């Protein structure tokens, strides 16, 4: 235990977290993904206090300033020094550029609104960190500061991914793409804590990051100052028309990448009633808008599904679920019906598709975003929205 470790008693939430970690099944040796923020810092501190053998692992994702850049590396190194644990840095900038930045730009150019965070978790963070920890340090587990919970279901033999206790900070939406193989080797120490609990516990440990401001949800926006600034750095302005669904021109834009489905504000269009973006036409470089009574969507098709808390169902399986179609949106009821994979999808890594029929029209069904299916707090699965109508 580090000499500078706190002697004051843990908060009730902190004490419960420590008890869970002390009784966690299996080996208590772990690499902690450290971004340099308060959440990952406390994750490492709690594991050390619970008696785990802990090593810090930071992925260097971008050059410049920010949580995933040099600033984050410095704070992460400082935390490891304070906790008296080893700190390792893996240069993942090329992988991040290839898997996330390039894919994001290509998506916006194609007229979709990509969700980089879930792909980053799967392709850049969790699986690569597990591989590095196992191969380089002989560590079978990783831990992160995500607000989500895990439970093993003895009946199904599957790990169930659950919402974090703090509804405002719950990050299960971004974790739907993690496989059972990954979930079996992951620990989420903050899953039962609220953000205020985290701040209090970080202060109790005297962590240098205890009062550090939160970064934006999207690290690229945080890195560039805004999402628009990020897009402007990669995509030159390309003027086009804003049109009604019948083709009537009602305005102009300087790039479809600056718009998303459901958007009402910032269109720069004067009309007799509010207009909403309903489609981005990349081929014609057009933003298609409609009044609210025309903007609702009753169903959508979801592809590249990853089944989490439930095994992949048979084609034409149907059940009611709660669906979340944006990170900050509330879940809504819908009927999920699985579909037979198309010939073009048959060889894909994740060929599963489904149709979602909503109880009431939805106004933010956005191709490229994730639709995540819930049963209560449990993530049943999720995939990427392909089409809507």
From Swiss-Prot:
Catalytic reactions on record: S-sulfanyl-L-cysteinyl-[protein] + uridine(34) in tRNA + AH2 + ATP = 2-thiouridine(34) in tRNA + L-cysteinyl-[protein] + A + AMP + diphosphate + H(+)
Chief place of localization: cytoplasm
GO cellular component, one term: cytoplasm
InterPro entries reported in the protein's UniProt record: MnmA-like, MnmA-like_C, MnmA-like_central, MnmA-like_central_sf, Rossmann-like_a/b/a_fold
The protein's Enzyme Commission number: 2.8.1.13
Site keyed Interaction with tRNA: positions: 146, 369
NCBIfam families: PRK00143.1, trmU
Similarity-based family: Belongs to the MnmA/TRMU family.
Biological role stated in the UniProt entry: Catalyzes the 2-thiolation of uridine at the wobble position (U34) of tRNA, leading to the formation of s(2)U34.
Name of the protein in its database record: tRNA-specific 2-thiouridylase MnmA
Taxonomic lineage from the root: Bacteria, Bacillati, Cyanobacteriota, Cyanophyceae, Synechococcales
């Amino acid at each position: 235990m580090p000499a500078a470790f706190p002697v004051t008693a843990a908060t009730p939430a902190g004490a419960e977290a420590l008890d869970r970690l002390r009784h966690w099944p299996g080996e208590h040796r772990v690499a902690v993904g450290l971004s340099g923020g308060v959440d990952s810092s406390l994750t490492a501190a709690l594991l050390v206090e619970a008696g785990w053998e802990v090593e810090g692992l930071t992925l260097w994702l971008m050059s410049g300033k920010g949580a995933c850049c040099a600033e984050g590396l410095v704070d992460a190194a400082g935390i490891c020094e304070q906790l008296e644990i080893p700190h390792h840095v893996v240069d993942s900038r090329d992988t991040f550029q290839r898997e996330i930045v390039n894919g994001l730009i290509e998506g916006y150019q194609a007229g979709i609104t990509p969700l980089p965070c879930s792909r980053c978790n799967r392709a850049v963070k969790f699986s690569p960190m597990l591989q590095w920890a196992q191969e380089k340090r002989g560590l079978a587990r990783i831990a992160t500061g995500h607000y989500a919970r895990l439970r093993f279901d003895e009946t199904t033999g599957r790990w169930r991914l659950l919402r974090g206790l703090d509804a405002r900070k719950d990050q299960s939406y971004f974790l739907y793409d993690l496989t059972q193989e990954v979930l079996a080797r992951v620990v989420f120490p903050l899953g039962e804590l609220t953000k205020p609990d985290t701040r209090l516990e970080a202060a109790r440990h005297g962590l240098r990051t205890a009062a550090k401001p939160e970064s934006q949800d999207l690290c690229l926006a945080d890195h560039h100052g805004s999402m628009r600034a990020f897009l402007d750095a990669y995509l030159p302005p390309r003027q086009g028309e804003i049109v009604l669904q019948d083709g009537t021109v009602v305005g102009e834009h300087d790039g479809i990448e600056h718009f998303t489905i459901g958007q009402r504000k910032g269109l720069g269009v004067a009309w007799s009633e509010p207009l909403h973006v309903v489609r981005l036409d990349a081929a014609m470089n057009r933003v298609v808008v409609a009044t609210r009574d025309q903007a609702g969507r009753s169903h959508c098709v979801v592809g590249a599904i990853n089944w989490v808390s439930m095994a992949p169902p048979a084609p034409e399986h149907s059940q009611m679920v709660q669906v979340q179609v944006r990170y900050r949106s509330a879940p809504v009821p819908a009927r999920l019906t699985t579909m037979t994979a198309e010939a073009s999808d048959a060889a894909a890594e994740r060929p599963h598709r489904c149709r979602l029929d909503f109880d009431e029209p939805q106004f933010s069904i956005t191709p490229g975003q994730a639709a995540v299916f819930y049963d209560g707090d449990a993530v049943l699965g999720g995939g990427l929205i392909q089409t809507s109508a």
